Design a protein with these regions (language model features):
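Extended, compositionally biased low-complexity polar/Lys-Gly-rich tracts
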Residues: 31-33, 198-200, 220
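Active-site flanking residues adjacent to catalytic metal/cofactor-binding acidic residues
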Residues: 137, 201, 214
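A short glycine-rich, hydrophobically flanked beta-strand micro-motif that places a catalytic Asp/Glu
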Residues: 146, 196-207
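Active-site nucleotide/adenylate-binding loops and adjacent lid/helix of ATP-dependent enzymes
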Residues: 2-189, 243
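C-terminal active-site "lid" helix and adjoining low-complexity regulatory extension at the edge
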Residues: 194, 207-243
Length: 243
């Protein structure tokens, strides 16, 4: 049996880096075709998938994979000790009268997350299902945002991606790295049992509040930024379960 990871047919810097990282690994990364259809003769050998969430879900069904991810309402259950902001999870219609609020749909598909002066400012609002579930939070200013690929409660690789209102993948300072790892250890000791063993966690510094959890994302569809591709690949593989 081959250990095949199905790659989205859409070429990205991340998928190209994963492909390169797999050269001396036990894994074979294959894009197959542009039809999002894994040929029958390869389906038993596909042990993981990486790409857009819709693509991954289609391939998972074809190849009998379980894609691990946190529960939809997971973030709303995390203590403010770690989020440093109030987070709510409810139907979109329940926030119709809120102003100056951050909103993100729980399925990551309905609309682009962001800060909105009014909920009705969401692009395409009139066509949205008002019963759909969303996260909301108070608006905060992030001074730094960092992506972490986590396996078995350990950060395997990490990369900054946002600093002072600009895209930035430069290395953390020694103090930032030390403080983030300390924050992560305190967080994971309390919440490890609520997460899959392979997951992507984003942490950051909120102005005036310090280190905080941003969110959790499935490894099988998360961007790498400047993370070590070989280490990220192992987390991605472990985030998919062959049934």
């Amino acid at each position: 049996m081959k250990n095949i990871i199905a790659l989205s047919p859409i070429y990205t810097e991340d998928s190209n880096n994963l492909k390169k990282a797999s050269i001396n690994s036990p894994y074979e990364l294959n894009r197959f075709n542009a039809k999002w259809n894994v040929p029958e003769e390869f389906r038993d050998d596909v042990i993981a998938v990486y790409g857009e969430d819709i693509y991954a879900e289609i391939v998972a069904e074809q190849c009998n994979l379980t894609l691990t991810k946190p529960k939809d309402n997971w973030l709303a259950g995390i203590s403010e000790q770690f989020t440093k902001r109030k987070i709510s999870y409810d139907q979109l219609k329940d926030f119709a009268n809120e102003e100056n609020i951050f909103i993100k749909c729980s399925d990551f598909k309905s609309f682009k997350a962001g800060v909105f002066d009014k909920v009705t400012d969401i692009k395409g609002f009139d066509s949205l299902d008002l019963n759909s579930m969303v996260f909301t939070s108070e608006v905060v200013e992030w001074e730094l945002e960092v992506r972490c690929f986590v396996l078995n409660n350990e950060i395997k690789t990490h990369s900054s991606y946002w600093r002072n209102n600009a895209f930035d993948t430069n290395s953390l300072s020694k103090t930032e790295q030390k403080d983030m790892f300390e924050f992560f250890q305190n967080f994971i000791q309390k919440y490890a049992e609520t997460l899959p063993k392979a997951i992507v966690l984003d942490f950051g510094i909120i102005k005036g509040k310090g280190w905080a959890l941003i969110e959790a994302n499935p490894a099988w569809c998360s961007g790498l930024y400047d993370c070590d591709a070989a280490k990220a690949l192992e987390v991605i593989v472990q985030s998919c379960i062959k049934n």
